[in-house]
């Protein structure tokens, strides 16, 4: 069972209660704190589109604490981050692994942050296939295409050479917040809010 805190605010019309995530959304904060799947991607995408409609010139903050997940769901979030007019600032809290790290790097340049004790992990996409040999071959080729696309984008976002990204993502590659800054995944390790 998931518990979601309720925030009560006083207004000129009396009291108003919000779940904590709706209250944070009023301040243009989105929290991605779960596995990335179609459901979480739909929620994040909808919130970004809503915030763009509310004010297309004001930044959106995306807090990430995620073990990663589905590549296609992650690309839905990534593409929306690039599509919306407001800059999307990314902040790693806890862990940004796999697609979570990819989305962390996808934030607006100069606006990608990690808290000091957070961890970042990149690796190649995971997949599996069953069935006839021809179908398995088709799926394997598709995973290689996706791997190359992820590596190319990560190279562009970090400034690292494509070949280095290929080597580093061959296996799980863990980084501290400072190491992620040196790598180019984040721009700054932030100890206190500015």
Swiss-Prot record:
Its EC number is 3.4.21.92. Keywords: Cytoplasm, Hydrolase, Protease, Serine protease. PROSITE patterns: CLP_PROTEASE_HIS, CLP_PROTEASE_SER. GO terms for biological process: protein quality control for misfolded or incompletely synthesized proteins. GO terms for cellular component: cytoplasm; endopeptidase Clp complex. GO terms for molecular function: ATP-dependent peptidase activity; ATPase binding; serine-type endopeptidase activity. It catalyses: Hydrolysis of proteins to small peptides in the presence of ATP and magnesium. alpha-casein is the usual test substrate. In the absence of ATP, only oligopeptides shorter than five residues are hydrolyzed (such as succinyl-Leu-Tyr-|-NHMec, and Leu-Tyr-Leu-|-Tyr-Trp, in which cleavage of the -Tyr-|-Leu- and -Tyr-|-Trp bonds also occurs). InterPro entries: ClpP, ClpP/crotonase-like_dom_sf, ClpP/TepA, ClpP_His_AS, ClpP_Ser_AS. SUPFAM superfamilies: ClpP/crotonase (SSF52096). It is found in: Cytoplasm. The active site is at residues 98, 123. Its main location: cytoplasm. Belongs to the peptidase S14 family. Cleaves peptides in various proteins in a process that requires ATP hydrolysis. Has a chymotrypsin-like activity. Plays a major role in the degradation of misfolded proteins. Fourteen ClpP subunits assemble into 2 heptameric rings which stack back to back to give a disk-like structure with a central cavity, resembling the structure of eukaryotic proteasomes. HAMAP family: ClpP. This is ATP-dependent Clp protease proteolytic subunit. It comes from Acetivibrio thermocellus (strain ATCC 27405 / DSM 1237 / JCM 9322 / NBRC 103400 / NCIMB 10682 / NRRL B-4536 / VPI 7372). The lineage of its organism: Bacteria, Bacillati, Bacillota, Clostridia, Eubacteriales.
């Amino acid at each position: 069972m998931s518990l979601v805190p309720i925030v009560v605010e006083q207004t000129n019309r009396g009291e108003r209660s919000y779940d904590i995530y709706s209250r944070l959304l009023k301040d243009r904060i989105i929290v991605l704190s779960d596995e990335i799947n179609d459901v979480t991607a739909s929620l994040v995408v909808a919130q970004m589109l809503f915030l763009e409609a509310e004010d297309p010139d004001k930044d959106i903050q995306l807090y990430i604490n995620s073990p990663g997940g589905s590549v296609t769901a992650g690309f839905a979030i990534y593409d929306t981050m690039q599509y919306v007019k407001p800059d999307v600032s990314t902040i790693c809290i806890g862990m940004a692994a796999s697609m979570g790290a990819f989305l962390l790097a996808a934030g607006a340049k100069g606006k990608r942050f990690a808290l000091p004790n957070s961890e970042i992990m990149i690796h190649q996409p995971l997949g599996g296939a069953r069935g006839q040999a021809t179908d398995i071959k088709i799926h394997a080729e598709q995973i290689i295409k996706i791997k190359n696309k992820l590596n190319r984008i990560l190279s562009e976002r970090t400034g690292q050479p494509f070949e280095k990204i290929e080597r580093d993502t061959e296996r799980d590659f863990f980084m501290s917040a400072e190491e992620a800054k040196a790598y180019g995944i984040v721009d700054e390790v932030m100890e206190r809010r500015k």
